[in-house]
Every structure is written in C-alpha cells, then in structure tokens.
Amino acid sequence: MKLSLFIIAVLMPVILLSACSDHAEEHASINTKKTVENITDVRKTAKTSIDWTKPSGGEYPDIKQKHVWIDVNVKEQKAYIKEGSNTIYTMMISSGLDQTKDDATPKGTFYVEPERGEWFFSEGYQEGAEYWVSWKNHGEFLFHSVPMTKDQKVIKTEAEKLGTKASHGCIRLTIPDAKWVYENIPEHTKVVIS
C-alpha cells in the first residue's frame, strides 16, 4: 500500500510535469516555426526600392570586342547582357503592365534598330525618358530610362516601380543603365524577350 501511495504521490506528478514540459516545448517549437515563416513571408513581399540613379548591376563590362545579345526576362524583370550563353551583366527593368494589348511588352526575337536618342517626350502619355534605343517598330518599343516630366525631372512614383511591370510596353532601365545601352549596344544586336 505504501508503495502504491508513493507512486501516486511522487512519481505521478513527475510523469505529468514531464509530459507537460514536452508539450510546452512542442508549442514553443511550433510558435518559433510560425514566427520564422512569418518573417520569411514579410521578406518575400517587402520590395526593396532600386536606385534609378545608379547602375543596377555594378561595374559595366567592356563589350567593344564581344558579340553580345540581350535576354529580357519579363517574369524576373531583368535584362541580361549575354555573350553566347554567359551572362556578363544584369539590369533591373520594368516591362509593360500586360493588362491590355496596348500596354504589353511584345515577346519574341527582335533586333536593335537604327533609331536612338538622348531624350524624347510623349504628349499622349505625358512622360518622357532619356537614352532611348529602339528594338521594335522603329521608335515604338524602346529601351529607355525611368520616366520623366516634360522638363526632364524623374517621375519618382514611376521610377520607384523599377523591378515590377509598370511601362506602356517599353523596357525601362535605371538612368545609367539606359545610357550604357544607348552608348554601347549597336544596331542589329539581338534582343530576346520572354
């Protein structure tokens, strides 16, 4: 009888505390896991603004003696300067909104056309841009800087969209990236947009 009372009085609380402790650890583990998942979700959805006044990929490559082409990935919102299958530079872009056929970036293989310039302004869109290079329809679809007002001031609300679908169909770039394309990418350079 004394042994039974000893088991009930002493060992039972120890067993119960041990079980509760394991259960508490399980809850702590689940809560920690959920917290980590929530932090990860916030990081996935938090958008880091791209500085449109700087090159988006660091130091530019020397391509004077190289045969390059441009691979535009609309899903990733990046333009890859490639030599063969090797990526030699990556630029952040904004392609067309893709909400209608009028604001979509055409997909396919194109070639840089002879039209290019240091500045344009569209009365219809009330937006302009620096350093434009045509790649389709001789001045309709362009690589160019982030949008600007008629007096050549950056439209910050539009520039802050760099890295997301935001344009009327053109490929927006940081100002230095657009200038580099304007100065370095020759006519007839292949442009693949997918």
UniProtKB/Swiss-Prot annotation:
<feature type="lipid moiety-binding region" description="S-diacylglycerol cysteine">
    <location>
        <position position="20"/>
    </location>
</feature>
<keyword id="KW-0732">Signal</keyword>
<keyword id="KW-1003">Cell membrane</keyword>
<protein>
    <recommendedName>
        <fullName>Putative L,D-transpeptidase YciB</fullName>
        <ecNumber>2.-.-.-</ecNumber>
    </recommendedName>
</protein>
<keyword id="KW-0449">Lipoprotein</keyword>
<dbReference type="GO" id="GO:0071555">
    <property type="term" value="P:cell wall organization"/>
</dbReference>
<dbReference type="GO" id="GO:0071972">
    <property type="term" value="F:peptidoglycan L,D-transpeptidase activity"/>
</dbReference>
<dbReference type="InterPro" id="IPR050979">
    <property type="entry name" value="LD-transpeptidase"/>
</dbReference>
<keyword id="KW-0133">Cell shape</keyword>
<comment type="pathway">
    <text>Cell wall biogenesis; peptidoglycan biosynthesis.</text>
</comment>
<dbReference type="GO" id="GO:0018104">
    <property type="term" value="P:peptidoglycan-protein cross-linking"/>
</dbReference>
<feature type="lipid moiety-binding region" description="N-palmitoyl cysteine">
    <location>
        <position position="20"/>
    </location>
</feature>
<feature type="signal peptide">
    <location>
        <begin position="1"/>
        <end position="19"/>
    </location>
</feature>
<dbReference type="Pfam" id="PF03734">
    <property type="entry name" value="YkuD"/>
</dbReference>
<keyword id="KW-0564">Palmitate</keyword>
<feature type="active site" description="Nucleophile">
    <location>
        <position position="170"/>
    </location>
</feature>
<keyword id="KW-0378">Hydrolase</keyword>
<keyword id="KW-0573">Peptidoglycan synthesis</keyword>
<comment type="similarity">
    <text>Belongs to the YkuD family.</text>
</comment>
<feature type="domain" description="L,D-TPase catalytic">
    <location>
        <begin position="68"/>
        <end position="194"/>
    </location>
</feature>
<dbReference type="GO" id="GO:0051286">
    <property type="term" value="C:cell tip"/>
</dbReference>
<dbReference type="GO" id="GO:0016757">
    <property type="term" value="F:glycosyltransferase activity"/>
</dbReference>
<keyword id="KW-0328">Glycosyltransferase</keyword>
<dbReference type="InterPro" id="IPR038063">
    <property type="entry name" value="Transpep_catalytic_dom"/>
</dbReference>
<keyword id="KW-0472">Membrane</keyword>
<dbReference type="GO" id="GO:0005886">
    <property type="term" value="C:plasma membrane"/>
</dbReference>
<dbReference type="GO" id="GO:0008360">
    <property type="term" value="P:regulation of cell shape"/>
</dbReference>
<dbReference type="InterPro" id="IPR005490">
    <property type="entry name" value="LD_TPept_cat_dom"/>
</dbReference>
<keyword id="KW-0961">Cell wall biogenesis/degradation</keyword>
<feature type="active site" description="Proton donor/acceptor">
    <location>
        <position position="144"/>
    </location>
</feature>
<keyword id="KW-0808">Transferase</keyword>
